[in-house]
Structure formats: C-alpha cells, structure tokens
C-alpha cells in the first residue's frame, strides 16, 4: 500500500527553512507511530508531500496505518494510490481503467489531475483526454464537473503517475514536536479532555497535570483517559503525567476559606501548583478546559482573578464553546464515555459562589490558608512517563489470576469497545459480559454479588488495576482472567 500525505496548508506558506523543519518533523512522527505496525515502513519526503509505503498486506494492519495517520497532527489529508511509470495519454487511460472501469458504467463522472514537473501537456489536457476516453470505453452516462457521482483522481509528478483509490481526512495542525510544549490541567471530564485534544490538534505537545481530589479511583480514571488521548493523537512524542495530591489542600480551603470564595481560591491554588510543575519541566504555557460562565468560577471577572495567581500564559481552547458542542466533540474523539463515568469535585464545594469576586477579598481569604500545605502537596507530586503510567500503577499489585474460567463464573471483558468489536472474546460454556474499563467502577455495584467475576483485558494490566480497586471497595468476588 502506498499513501501520499498532504501536509497542513498553513505549513506550505512558511519560509523555506521553517517549512522544511515542519515537514521533517512530520516524517519523523509518522515513522515513530507506524513502526509498531510495520518495522520496515518507508517514509519519503518532497517539498509539500510525504510518501508512505508498506509491503504488508494484512487488512487489519493497513487499516491501522490509515487510522493512525488520520489522528496525527500535521496532516491535512492523505491519498491511497497506485503508482506507475508515466506513459503516453493512452497508457494513462489504461491505468485509470484498471481501478475505475467497474465503477463508471451508468455514472456521471469527472476527472481531476494534479501535475508537478515539466511536461508537454497541461493538467486540463489530461482531464479532457482521459475523461473522453473513459466515457466512451467504460459505459459512463456522461461527464459532470460540478456534482459528479464519481471523481477519477490522479497525480502526475515528473515521470510518475499516481492513480488515487481513496482520500482520507487528517487532523490538520502542525506536527507535534515542531512547536512549544504545554501543561494541561486534567480533571478527566468533558472539558479538560477536549481542551487537551484541541491543543494537540493544533500541534502543541501536551503534558498532563492532575490534581487528585477524589482518591485512587479518580486518579486511575484520569490516567486512563490521558493515556487514551496520548495514544490516539500524540504517541509520536513522549510526555509526562503529573499527579499532585490535593486532598489536604482542599481540606484547608474547606476549613479556612469562606464558602462563597472556595471555587476561585481552589482554582488559584491549582494554577500556582501547575506553574511550579511547569517551571520544573521548563514549560511556559498552561492549558485549562474552562469556558465563559459555564460555572460560577468561570465568569470573566473570576477568570481574571484566577489568572492573576500565575505569571504563565493560560490558554483556554474552549473559552467561547457551548457545552453541547464540547460534548459532541468529546463523543467524536472518543473521550465522552470516559468523562461520563469520571468523578467531578471542583463544582460541588461552593454554595452560593461569587460570580464577581473581588481581588482584595480573595487575597484576604488566601491569607487564612497555610501555604505550607500547598508546598507539601508539590513535594509529593508524582511524575510518570505517559507510556508507562498504567504499567507503573499495576506493578506492585498482587491479585489472584486464573487461566481457566469455570461454568458459573462470569468473564467481564473490560477492553475498549473498539477492541471488543474487532476481536470478540469467546470462551465456550462461560458467560461473557462486555463492560468497558471506564464504566466498570460505576456499574459493578449493580451486578449480582452472588456471582464470581473474572476481569479480562489483552495484557492483564487494566484488569489487575480495576480488580485491585474493586477488592479495596469490599467486592471479594473479583479475579483476573489471563488465558494461557
């Protein structure tokens, strides 16, 4: 399979050195991400396109390559093509017939040709000749330039002909690694996950910073969704997941700060802590998922006060986005189900919160706060490479594993729905339920507690993590299923 990758149009208007830098970075990213699927993948570059070629023929691998390219920042679109040496016009017609002859009968079609190099013909010459010949030779109903049923696409570059099979849309944006780094404040809900995606889509590397207000289950949930976002949209780069224990900070706020100002003060403490983490990582920009007036702490006066707690630039990609649009985008990018089952704490600690807090009052409330508690939280912060975050969590967990399931036991397949659909788990004589990992903790309590449940995932890592959490919650009827 051969693919021609078209770069983000804004890259093509850069100066030659910058353009070259961005395209080189994109090629590097493509190799990094596709190497897992094909160790011998070939990526070549020209001025405004990249060519990707694999010799593998497994349909699942080829689909995996297309899926990963469609989720990679820096790519406007990519074409699946068949390459031939350029012959005369009749040879071009013959090559097009190989791919379109069965599709043309009875259709209104057009021909589109893009050309680069020196030739004694124009792109329009090719379109006219090939179109007329295909109409006569393939039984097409006619030629329609404005709204054709089918478009015969090709590209000619120097002495090479590319007949286009299909065109796939990319993410756009700049390639990760070519622009600056950011630190995204993650709660795991709809807003923060979509904000992280928007930043990555534009081409900015996103490290993840989580303030743990809700214990182990909340931390695990945020780690899972952060890993999902990174793996799907940003795995060409290695980034960090930072977890800051914020329970004691929250407790100090609840004890010392007036109820109406708790939300603003909590957000200011988070920005102070995030700034300290960013300094440690040499990052100049913070990212949050806040939108104007979505909650009381997000009015313009309050956002201004919150930003005053840091010297860092604070980006809010969703600042003017409606909530339903955020939810729709979360559904599109795959984070909505994570968010629906994620505990949320920030919005419930204030009663009658101030929507127009005053600086002097906020500073007065913060004078009651023991800043040593914030410093202690930062000292206990954990930094883990995002690609190891799930493995590190499960490393010291001792959970009973079984290699065979017995009649009467229930296997719960906790893999992502995509994996469940692609490779359904089948164990003869044993009941199997599908319950994705991000919904397991919230739905497990509704299951029959007289049954014994075996959690299953591909590598056993996620199943061990969730089994450990369920056992710690008092559910003694949980094991891990690891078939031999």
UniProtKB/Swiss-Prot annotation:
List the keywords (alphabetical).
Answer: ATP-binding, Cytoplasm, Disulfide bond, Nucleotide-binding, Redox-active center, RNA-binding, Thiamine biosynthesis, Transferase, tRNA-binding
Active-site residues (renumbered)? 457 (cysteine persulfide intermediate)
Matching entries from InterPro entries are given as: Rhodanese-like_dom, Rhodanese-like_dom_sf, Rossmann-like_a/b/a_fold, ThiI_AANH, ThiI_fer, ThiI_N, THII_Thiazole_biosynth_dom, THUMP_dom
Record GO terms (molecular function): ATP binding; CCA tRNA nucleotidyltransferase activity; tRNA binding; tRNA-uracil-4 sulfurtransferase activity
- State the disulfide connectivity: 346-457
EC number from the UniProt entry: 2.8.1.4
Rhodanese domain mapped to chain residues: 405-483
- Pathway recorded for this protein: Cofactor biosynthesis; thiamine diphosphate biosynthesis
**Which is a GO BP term held by this UniProt record?**
thiazole biosynthetic process
Query: Start and end of every THUMP domain?
Result: 63-167
Q: Which reaction does it catalyse?
A: [ThiI sulfur-carrier protein]-S-sulfanyl-L-cysteine + a uridine in tRNA + 2 reduced [2Fe-2S]-[ferredoxin] + ATP + H(+) = [ThiI sulfur-carrier protein]-L-cysteine + a 4-thiouridine in tRNA + 2 oxidized [2Fe-2S]-[ferredoxin] + AMP + diphosphate; [ThiS sulfur-carrier protein]-C-terminal Gly-Gly-AMP + S-sulfanyl-L-cysteinyl-[cysteine desulfurase] + AH2 = [ThiS sulfur-carrier protein]-C-terminal-Gly-aminoethanethioate + L-cysteinyl-[cysteine desulfurase] + A + AMP + 2 H(+)
- GO cellular component terms listed in the entry, alphabetical order: cytosol
Q: Localized where?
A: Cytoplasm
State where it is primarily located. Answer: cytoplasm
Question: Which residues does ATP bind?
Answer: 185-186, 267, 289, 298
Instruction: Enumerate the SUPFAM superfamilies for this protein.
Output: Adenine nucleotide alpha hydrolases-like, Rhodanese/Cell cycle control phosphatase, THUMP domain-like
In terms of domain of life, where is this protein from? Answer: Bacteria
Name the NCBIfam families for this protein.
ThiI_C_thiazole, tRNA uracil 4-sulfurtransferase ThiI
Similarity comment: Belongs to the ThiI family.
Relate the protein's function as given in its record.
Catalyzes the ATP-dependent transfer of a sulfur to tRNA to produce 4-thiouridine in position 8 of tRNAs, which functions as a near-UV photosensor. Also catalyzes the transfer of sulfur to the sulfur carrier protein ThiS, forming ThiS-thiocarboxylate. This is a step in the synthesis of thiazole, in the thiamine biosynthesis pathway. The sulfur is donated as persulfide by IscS.
What name goes with this protein? Answer: tRNA sulfurtransferase
Q: Which organism is it from?
A: Pseudomonas syringae pv. tomato (strain ATCC BAA-871 / DC3000)
